[in-house]
Every structure is written in structure tokens, then in C-alpha cells.
């Protein structure tokens, strides 16, 4: 059911994750982009709702999070284009469409405990904070971790908890989780992450090797074992192990 509902957007998702230029909104005069709020509203309407994001709660969450606060100052004027933007240490903040697409795939209803692996700038964690009860994020890069902690604190996200560490290991002290989202590519689910997922829970991640087109998949933990659904072709950087 979930995969079928997302089919109209699949062709757009690969283009977005591969570079985003083809999906950027450049059709409005600069005079209309007067405030981040108006740009955010247009992003939700034209980049998300018009392209297949149907979960009302996801659309509302995307409309509340100030993406410009999660990117370096020199990129803030581009914050609401549907493109990845550099955040330092060779990493990027994902396009709004990709963040919304993955959040929708988690099928959150409110109150859940969610783990994000590769929390980066903290933007996706902020979106998830509007959809779940508590969000736990793991980031390997010390600089990105420190900056995201500061940004989320300034914005008042008290239900987001971040740590620096190896995403392969998850966060056993805060497990179990109803949902896990991984923002970097893996060829298989690490055993610790699977063990930290509750029965009936979902993990969304890009499946495949580095340098190739990967598949965004959602895997549900059932009594009979994992049930995997293929959602869309994507390109993500690979997950790295901690030193």
C-alpha cells in the first residue's frame, strides 16, 4: 500500500537525490521570496504536496521547521530550493523532498521513539520531532554533531537527543525504537540496528553499494522475519564506521 501510493513520485526522487538542479524552483520572481516563511510555504505546496507527499502531518512538520537555520549562512538564500546544500566536512543537508519522502515512509502516528542514523545538520531530526514522541540522532562527524546540538537547542527542540558515535551500533541505551531512519547507504541492516527495532517497527534506508544507484527501502520487523518494500531509486553517500 505504501509503495503503491508513492509511485507517482519515484521518477522525481532519483533526480532529486542525484543533484537536484532539475527539480529546483526557479520560476518565481525574487520579489516573491521576501521571507523564509513564504518560501517554506511554497516549498510545501509545490515541491512536496504537488509531487506526491500525502501525509498531512509530514506536510505540516515540513512547514514548521526553518531549514535556513540548518545550513551555513552563505547558503541560506538557497535553503528552500529542492537541492542538497553543503554543511561542511564533505556532507550535505538532504533536499526537502527527500526528507519528507523518508519521513512519510516511516508512517509515524505520534508518540513513537525514533532513531536517526547520520543526523548531520539536525534538519531531519527536527522534522521527525513534530511527528514522534522522542527522536535520537547519531552523527559521526564531531563538528556537525556540535553544530546540530546548538541549532536544535536554540530552536527549542527538547524532544531531540543527539550523540556523536558509530551509527552501525545504534543507541542501545535508548532502545527499543518504533522507527529507524538511516540517512546514508548500507548494503544490509547492521545487527545492532535490527535488534533495537521493536516488533512491528520500520527501518527506512538506502540499500546498495557506494557509487551506484541504490534503492530506498522500508523494512518491517514481523514475527516471520523482515518484510521489505522497495520505494524508489536514490543516491546516498555510504555509511562510515567510527574510528
Curated annotation (Swiss-Prot):
The active site is at 94. One of its GO terms (molecular function) is protein-L-isoaspartate (D-aspartate) O-methyltransferase activity. It is found in: Cytoplasm. Transmembrane segments: none annotated. Its main location: cytoplasm. SUPFAM superfamilies: S-adenosyl-L-methionine-dependent methyltransferases. Gene3D superfamilies: Vaccinia Virus protein VP39. GO terms for biological process: methylation; protein modification process; protein repair. Pfam families: PCMT. CDD domains: AdoMet_MTases (cd02440). Keywords: Cytoplasm, Methyltransferase, S-adenosyl-L-methionine, Transferase. Residues 23-42 have a biased composition (Basic and acidic residues). It catalyses: [protein]-L-isoaspartate + S-adenosyl-L-methionine = [protein]-L-isoaspartate alpha-methyl ester + S-adenosyl-L-homocysteine. Belongs to the methyltransferase superfamily. L-isoaspartyl/D-aspartyl protein methyltransferase family. This is Protein-L-isoaspartate O-methyltransferase 2. It comes from Anaeromyxobacter sp. (strain Fw109-5).
Amino acid at each position: 500500500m505504501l509503495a503503491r501510493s508513492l509511485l507517482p513520485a519515484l521518477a522525481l526522487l532519483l533526480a532529486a537525490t542525484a543533484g537536484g538542479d532539475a527539480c529546483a524552483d526557479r520560476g518565481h520572481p525574487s520579489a516573491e521570496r521576501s521571507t523564509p516563511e513564504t518560501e517554506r510555504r511554497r516549498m510545501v505546496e509545490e515541491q512536496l504536496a504537488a509531487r506526491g507527499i500525502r501525509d498531512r502531518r509530514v506536510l505540516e512538520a515540513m512547514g514548521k521547521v526553518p531549514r535556513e537555520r540548518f545550513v551555513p549562512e552563505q547558503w541560506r538564500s538557497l535553503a528552500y530550493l529542492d537541492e542538497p546544500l553543503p554543511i561542511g566536512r564533505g556532507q550535505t543537508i538532504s533536499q526537502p523532498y527527500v526528507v519528507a519522502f523518508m519521513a512519510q515512509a516511516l508512517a509515524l502516528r505520534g508518540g513513537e521513539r525514533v532513531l536517526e542514523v547520520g543526523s548531520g545538520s539536525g534538519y531531519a531530526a527536527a522534522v521527525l520531532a513534530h511527528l514522534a514522541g522522542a527522536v535520537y540522532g547519531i552523527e559521526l562527524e564531531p563538528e556537525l554533531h556540535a553544530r546540530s546540538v546548538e541549532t536544535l537547542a536554540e530552536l527549542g527542540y527538547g524532544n531531540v537527543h543527539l550523540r556523536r558515535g558509530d551509527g552501525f551500533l545504534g543507541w542501545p541505551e535508548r532502545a527499543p525504537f518504533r522507527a529507524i531512519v538511516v540517512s546514508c547507504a548500507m548494503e544490509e541492516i547492521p545487527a545492532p540496528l535490527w535488534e533495537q527495532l521493536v516488533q512491528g517497527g520500520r527501518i527506512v534506508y538506502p540499500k546498495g553499494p557506494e557509487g551506484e544507484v541504490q534503492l530506498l527501502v522500508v523494512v518491517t520487523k514481523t514475527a516471520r522475519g523482515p518484510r521489505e518494500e522497495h520505494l524508489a531509486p536514490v543516491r546516498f553517500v555510504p555509511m562510515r564506521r567510527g574510528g
